[in-house]
Curated annotation (Swiss-Prot):
InterPro entries documented for this protein: Serpin_CS, Serpin_dom, Serpin_fam, Serpin_sf, Serpin_sf_1, Serpin_sf_2
Alphabetical list of PANTHER family matching this protein: GH10112P-RELATED, SERINE PROTEASE INHIBITOR, SERPIN
One GO MF term: serine-type endopeptidase inhibitor activity
Organism domain of life: Eukaryota
Job description of the protein: Probable serine protease inhibitor.
Family: Belongs to the serpin family.
Entry protein name: Serpin-ZXB
Keywords tagged on the record: Protease inhibitor, Serine protease inhibitor
A single Gene Ontology CC term: extracellular space
Pfam families hit by this protein: Serpin
Disulfide bonds: none
Length: 405
């Protein structure tokens, strides 16, 4: 394996680690209210794109300096040897390898866009613009925050609406930008994939889904008798649902991580966070005959302002008056720039046809001896993620506590 491939593998491992750290923080009962505290308390389903957030913060790092850049690299990159340049190289490879649309070739439809909206009184530093446009394929827009902030917010929202095929209509809520805003860095991600093996809608039946509080609801469950990629362990079952492939090497799949315990969701999220290779070691590699199979249909729309959550993870300087973002714009005003907020929204829908989604260790694991058939009954809270299997890049992650929400 050459150095570039090795670097990419290491970068992907850290992107996955970042994904699971965020997922654990969002699913924690102690989650900050501004970062979906209701979700942490078990009150709502969660879906977000760690890849979208990773790219947004990496672009901030392109204009950061000193300790601010170091904090960003520490959270996003390789501890001890990561660099901002490494983040940009990773972003460039992800945009080219993972986020290229494969629908013309018969695979999932993938759309991704980066945007830099800068006040017309300022100009981007050449070094920052070169990275933003060259590595991140960002569009740059000169706008008037100082006298037309509401119109600019509407412009950004329309851009996100277009990229996500109308699934996310508003990334910037009313009042989120004003005359003091100088720069908005945004990205949007859209994914729509059809299952390799679609579910028969006539077999979808209502069944009981048990909630974290012990109550239950009636929800529509998809069912099948076909063989499935499924691995079974003492406290966990992992289901892999592949999407139809295009003619390239990429293979997108959804993974359902179902804890054995009805209330095992939070401890599973914590386990993924504490053991970065936990998932990789449990990915199903062979199809097995299933006995009883039930998977609920679900649709999640989830948004949050991420700065408080990121501060908990140690990223504080970019959001403070001590931020060093002097590499973004060529103006004396650059010394006063900081990230006031980081908005994120995601949408994920799973049904019989497939998925539509948008966003703006060394331990040996032994496989439990599989019986002749394996049941997979997702009738209680579970984690899910959408991943590109060739690279291991996680596009979306979330949890379902109630499929009716």
């Amino acid at each position: 394996m050459d150095a570039t491939a090795t670097d990419l593998r290491v970068s992907i491992a850290h992107q996955t680690r970042f994904a699971f750290r965020l997922a654990a923080a969002l699913s924690s009962p102690r989650a900050h209210p501004a970062a979906g505290g209701a979700a942490g308390a078990g009150g709502s389903n969660v879906a977000f794109s760690p890849l979208s957030l990773h790219v947004a913060l990496s672009l901030v790092a392109a204009g950061a300096g000193g300790a601010t850049r170091d904090q960003l690299v520490s959270l996003l990159g390789v501890p001890g040897r990561g660099t901002a340049e490494g983040l940009h190289a990773f972003a460039e490879q992800v945009v080219q390898l993972v986020l290229a649309d494969s629908s013309p070739a018969g695979g999932p439809r993938v759309a991704f866009a980066d945007g830099v909206f800068i006040d017309s009184s300022l100009s981007l530093m050449k070094s920052f613009k070169d990275v933003a446009v060259g590595k991140y394929k960002a569009e740059t827009h000169s706008v008037d925050f100082q006298t037309k902030a509401a119109e600019v917010a509407s412009q950004v929202n329309s851009w996100v609406d277009r990229v996500t095929s109308g699934l996310i209509k508003e990334i910037l809520p009313p009042g989120s930008v004003d005359h003091t805003t100088r720069l908005v860095l945004g990205n949007a991600l859209y994914f729509k994939g059809a299952w390799t093996e679609k579910f028969d809608a006539s077999k979808t039946k209502d069944g009981e889904f048990r909630l974290l509080d012990g109550k239950s609801v009636l929800a529509p469950f998809m069912s099948t008798s076909k063989k499935q990629y499924l691995s079974s362990y003492d406290s966990l079952k992992v289901l892999k649902l592949p999407y139809q492939k295009g003619r390239d090497l990429r293979q997108f799949s959804m993974y359902i991580l179902l804890p054995e315990a009805q209330d095992g969701l939070w401890s599973l999220a914590a386990k993924l966070n504490s053991e970065p290779e936990f998932l990789e070691k449990r990915i199903p590699t062979r199809q097995v005959t299933v006995g009883k199979f039930k998977l609920p249909k679900f649709k999640i729309s989830f948004g949050f302002e991420a700065s408080d959550l990121l501060k908990i993870l140690g990223l504080q300087l970019p959001f403070s008056s001590k931020a060093d973002l002097t590499g973004m714009v060529g103006s004396p005003e650059r010394h006063n720039l900081f990230v006031s907020s980081l908005f994120h929204k995601s949408f994920v829908q799973v049904d019989e046809e497939g998925t539509e989604a948008a966003a703006a260790s060394a331990a040996v694991v032994s496989f439990r001896s599989a019986p002749v058939t394996v049941d997979f009954v997702a009738d209680h809270p579970f984690l899910f993620l959408i991943r590109e299997d060739m690279t291991g890049v996680v596009l979306f992650i979330g949890h379902v506590v109630n499929p009716l929400l």
